[in-house]
UniProtKB/Swiss-Prot annotation:
Stored InterPro entries: Isoprenoid_synthase_dom_sf (IPR008949), Terpene_cyclase-like_1_C (IPR034741), Terpene_cyclase_plant_C1 (IPR044814), Terpene_synth_N (IPR001906), Terpene_synth_N_sf (IPR036965), Terpene_synthase-like (IPR050148), Terpene_synthase_metal-bd (IPR005630), Terpenoid_cyclase/PrenylTrfase (IPR008930)
Name recorded for this polypeptide: Bifunctional levopimaradiene synthase, chloroplastic
Cell location: Plastid, Chloroplast
Source organism superkingdom: Eukaryota
Domain notes: The Asp-Xaa-Asp-Asp (DXDD) motif is important for the catalytic activity in the class II active site relevant for the cyclization of GGPP. The Asp-Asp-Xaa-Xaa-Asp/Glu (DDXXD/E) motif is important for the catalytic activity in the class I active site, presumably through binding to Mg(2+).
Residues that bind Mg(2+) 2: 602, 606
Native organism taxonomy: Eukaryota, Viridiplantae, Streptophyta, Embryophyta, Tracheophyta
Entries under PANTHER family matching the protein: (E,E)-GERANYLLINALOOL SYNTHASE, ENT-COPALYL DIPHOSPHATE SYNTHASE, CHLOROPLASTIC
Motif DXDD motif: where in chain: 383-386
Organism, as annotated: Pinus taeda (Loblolly pine)
Record-listed E.C. numbers: 4.2.3.32, 4.2.3.132, 5.5.1.12
Entry binding sites for Mg(2+) 1: 602, 606
SUPFAM superfamilies reported for this sequence: Terpenoid cyclases/Protein prenyltransferases, Terpenoid synthases
Statement: the UniProt record of this protein carries the keyword rRNA processing: no
Length: 850
């Protein structure tokens, strides 16, 4: 119904309440090109409001809508051509990729109890054990021989290619004591003593965070042994006295019965507590596998004191695996599997290993405990590092795990710790808790608490210039932390994370237990080589696809449209950043073309076309009638012809893939979309500010994410039944949450600029209308809260919607995430030429990794 241009009041009754609008004399200037004015075509649906034009009242002025002036697109053809690298996928690259995939699959399939390197320290303790037959020989002579054969050139024992003074000094001290006990290797002992004398002082130069676990317990105890054996060591060095004092202080803080009350990390260092341990009581805390917290050294010390057969069985088990040496702890089966899965996912190569990942996670889940897990399946002491990693990965893969497991690791002050009784936290464990906290479900307050606590800790670590870690020596842990804080889960797209982690990943990273150790199934060159080759290969295909999209854009005449934003590369970046696998090329193309039309038509309906012409456009889509184009202005002719031809082609391809006609489905999707655009145009024309609920009901559709997803889903490689389509359809909670979160993040970053251009309806403004007593700042805060809660619910829908094919679930969820990225700091689509999005596009599509 058109409002008449008379001086008389008119009333349109559509509900129970009345709102005043001003008179309109003539037609409303839409601020478009000369001679074009927006007619007041109004279509009112059902609702509680009625709008009236009230004579003599002017409750708000009707501003001239400001013509949209968009920055020109940055990614023109000549820019894209100038950035095209010389890289092409060579046959040798394809062959190498296949070889690496096979080797890594075999790596996953061969995972047992954990692969790791020798620990000279633990091997020395096992070598101390006298033969059980009473002969004056070692029970494990092969371990003693290993010590004799593996002294380094500088006289130390330890990891040859990674010098850590704490680690070298501790291992060297253990080895020279063992050799002295067995009265062998005099030359090695003297070289070891010389190393100790010349290098011990370097410990003072190392960060406290690099001090191995339990060092202040076992090192002073071994020094006491060395002194009793007459070894000439510099016992009076200041740092040695400081370590002894730390040991005494720690033991004084230890409640007398804590050692025996429940399993703690003290079980890991019993060799350093021999003078205070009640050996009968301690046996109650022995693990099922016979070890004490998987530590060969601790277990060896207990065996020498008790002769316990299960201890001996454990040591025999470890030596059967490793031959003539032992690691610093074993097994490491849960740790190895979780971190291997996390590594291939972060490097972006997980799509090659779906079966292997499932097998690994099935194994972990079979040993999941509601109190948490440790690094091994029979480890009685859970830690927050493995638990948080397990909670996040298992949840995202659809396993039923509760966030309540984190309560095990929260103290009375609300702070989170790694182990029971621990006073120091590490960067890597807090980083993993932080990453975990972002996959929260609604109402999980423990996840919110974990997020706030770990963000505070990690930001402080960065500000202090540290970000060094007590559990790992990584290539660039600082870079990992910076990425996680800047791009948390809901704005971290897979290709961007892969790019970042390829740069931060260390194939030679080491971990810190009681000694330094390596995990070759977690850190290795094969993962990195495959990640680089695969990234560059996928990027090459993406560049070719983008060129095809550019040709489509130009041949359709869209470059002639002066009223809209040309953002072809930025829009293509969206699906390429998450649905990146080569087999989804058609889906990416459909996603990009559909998205481009949502931008064109949004700009058309928002501020360019008259309402009469918009009605004609909508009717043309509804009737799918090209003949109506003759009644349209030239720019709208270009729009509709391109629209008509493109979606006819898409529908034909969809028919082939789905085995049924999909054109009517696509039409209906677009009808709903254009209705939402039209309603916004009507509101804008009369300066109508709806209630928040009324606004969101329409705006969650007008954001157009649903239209993009519902059409693109036809090309995910799955046959989509009506039942499946209903689960991601307009009435589904899943799709609604995607649209809601996309709309809210858009509004929070653009409402002020759009208000200056004459727009009156946004989530913030509509909420303020419902609650006139609150400030704009309070309204904005409330909208953010709504969005955060909706993102939590979106997590749950994504994880639990297992009736929906994985690729369709990804399509919905990742589309919500890309919106969080684009509107992270502002309007990343409109202003992408001078924002970080430009760098993301470049890194994702044009810049190969070296």
């Amino acid at each position: 119904m058109a409002l008449p241009s008379s001086s008389l009041s008119s009333q349109i009754h559509t509900g129970a309440t009345t709102q005043c609008i001003p008179h309109f004399h003539g037609s409303l200037n839409a601020g478009t090109s000369a001679g074009k004015r927006r007619s007041l075509y109004l279509r009112w649906g059902k609702g509680p409001s009625k709008i009236v034009a009230c004579a003599g009242q002017d409750p708000f002025s009707v501003p001239t809508l400001v013509k949209r002036e968009f920055p020109p697109g940055f990614w023109k053809d000549h820019v894209i051509e100038s950035l095209m690298p010389s890289y092409k996928v060579a046959p040798s690259d394809e062959k190498r990729i296949e070889t690496l995939i096979t080797e890594i699959k075999n790596m996953f399939r061969s995972m047992g109890y954990g692969e790791t390197n020798p620990s000279a320290y633990d091997t020395a303790w096992v070598a101390r054990i006298p033969a059980v037959d009473g002969s004056e020989k070692p029970q494990f002579p092969e371990t003693l021989e290993w010590i004799l054969q593996n002294q380094l050139k500088d006289g130390s024992w330890g990891e040859e290619f990674y010098f850590l003074a704490y680690d070298r000094i501790l291992a060297t001290l253990a080895c020279i004591i063992t050799l002295t006990i067995w009265q062998t290797g005099d030359t090695q002992v003297q070289k070891g003593i010389e190393f100790f004398k010349t290098q011990a002082g370097k410990i003072e130069e190392e960060a406290d965070s690099h001090r191995p676990s339990g060092f202040e317990i076992v090192f002073p105890a071994m020094l006491k042994e060395a002194k009793a054996l007459g070894l000439a060591l510099p016992y009076e060095l200041p740092f040695i006295q400081q370590i002894i004092e730390k040991r005494e202080a720690k033991l004084q803080r230890l409640p007398p019965d804590l050692l025996y009350a429940l399993p703690t990390t003290l079980l890991y260092s019993l060799e350093g507590l021999q003078e205070i341990v009640d050996w009968e009581k301690i046996m109650k805390l022995q693990s099922k596998d016979g070890s004490f917290l998987s530590s060969p050294a601790s277990t060896a010390a207990v065996f020498m004191r008790t002769g316990n057969k299960k201890c001996l069985e454990f040591l025999n088990f470890v030596l059967k695996k490793f031959g003539n040496h032992v690691p610093c702890h074993y097994p490491l089966d849960l740790f190895e599997r979780l971190w291997a899965v996390d590594t291939v996912e972060r490097l972006g190569i997980d799509h090659h290993f779906k079966e292997e990942i499932k097998d690994a996670l099935d194994y972990v889940y079979s040993h999941w405990d509601e109190r948490g897990i440790g690094w091994a399946r029979e480890n009685p002491v859970p830690d927050i590092d493995d638990t948080a990693m397990g909670l996040r990965i298992l949840r995202l893969h659809g396993y039923n795990v509760s966030s309540d497991v984190l309560k095990t690791f929260r103290d009375e002050n609300g702070e989170f710790f790694c182990f029971l009784g621990q006073t120091q936290r590490g960067v890597t464990d807090m980083l993993n808790v932080n990453r975990c906290s972002h996959v929260a479900f609604p109402g999980e307050t423990i996840m919110e608490e974990a997020k706030l606590c770990t963000e505070r800790y990690l930001r402080n670590a960065l500000e202090d210039g540290g970000a060094s870690d007590k559990w790992a020596l990584k290539k660039n842990i600082r870079g990992e932390v910076e990425y996680a804080l800047k791009y948390p889960w809901h704005r971290s797209m897979p290709r961007l994370e892969a790019r970042s982690y390829i740069e931060n990943y260390g194939p030679n990273d080491v971990w810190l237990g009681k000694t330094m150790y390596m995990m070759p199934n977690i850190s290795n060159e094969k993962y990195l080589e495959l990640a680089k080759l695969d990234f560059n290969r996928v990027q090459f295909f993406h560049r070719q696809e983008l060129q095809d999209i550019r040709r489509w854009w130009n041949s359709s005449g869209f470059s002639q449209l002066g009223f809209t934003r040309e953002r072809v590369a930025e829009i293509y970046f969206s699906p390429a950043s998450f649905l990146f696998e080569p087999e989804f090329a058609t889906c990416r193309a459909v996603y990009t073309k559909t998205s481009n039309f949502t931008v064109i038509l949004d700009d058309l309906y928002d501020a360019h076309g008259t309402l009469d012409n918009l009605k004609l456009f909508s009717e043309s889509v509804k009737r799918w009638d090209l003949s109506l184009v003759d009644q349209m202005p030239q720019d709208m002719k270009i729009c509709f012809k391109g629209f008509y031809n493109t979606f006819n082609e898409i529908a034909e391809e969809g028919r082939k893939r789905q085995g049924r006609d999909v054109l009517s489905y696509i039409q209906k999707v677009w009808e709903v979309q254009l209705e939402a655009y039209t309603k916004e145009a009507e509101w804008s024309a009369v300066r109508y500010v709806p209630s928040y609920d009324e606004y969101i009901g329409n705006a969650s559709v007008s954001i157009a994410l649903g239209t993009v997803v519902l059409i693109s889903a036809l090309f995910t490689g799955e046959i989509l039944t009506d039942d499946i389509l209903s689960k991601i359809g307009r009435d589904s909670r899943f799709l609604y949450l995607m649209g809601l979160t996309g709309r809210l993040v858009n509004d929070t970053k653009t409402y002020q600029a759009e208000r200056g251009q004459g727009e009156v309806a946004s989530a913030v403004q509509c909420y303020m209308k419902d609650h006139p007593e609150i400030s704009e700042e309070e309204a904005l805060k409330h909208v953010y809260t709504i969005m955060d809660n909706a993102l939590d619910e979106l997590n749950r829908e994504f994880v639990n919607n297992r009736d929906v094919p994985d690729t369709c679930r990804r399509l919905v969820f990742e589309t919500a995430r890309i919106m969080q990225l684009f509107y992270m700091d502002g309007d990343g689509l409109t202003l992408s030429h001078n924002m970080e999005i430009k760098e993301h596009v470049k890194n994702c599509l044009f810049q190969p990794v070296a």
